[in-house]
């Protein structure tokens, strides 16, 4: 059977139901019982909404008209969580690089936001941990040419001399 409960798409398969041959409602009652248990004990939680930054996720920019820019979620990051669970979701933001060079287009992929399930049910229901791409919030233009020249000069001196 399948149903939608609290933004969750539930699909159940019930095997070896007791008295299924004698009672024609046994299979239906067992399936309904499983669905009720899930609907009453679990909820979909959105950890990051599409187009919004997650907490203090940002990147540093070299040679840009801004030194930092926020990272925003490319999609929603949704998880299934026990109702009443007091465990905080473990979410990490990992940058693709420490620093990015300007110019950067809007919505450039700059890292990933990942969730690690710390409240496993059995071995867990996920094959791999959910993650989404984080991207630049807006376009970042290259800074004033003297600033860019100076930064390149300092970088050259630090690396070559």
For each predicted feature, which ranges?
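Domain-terminus/edge residues, biased toward the C-terminal soluble/receptor-binding domains
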Residues: 1-161
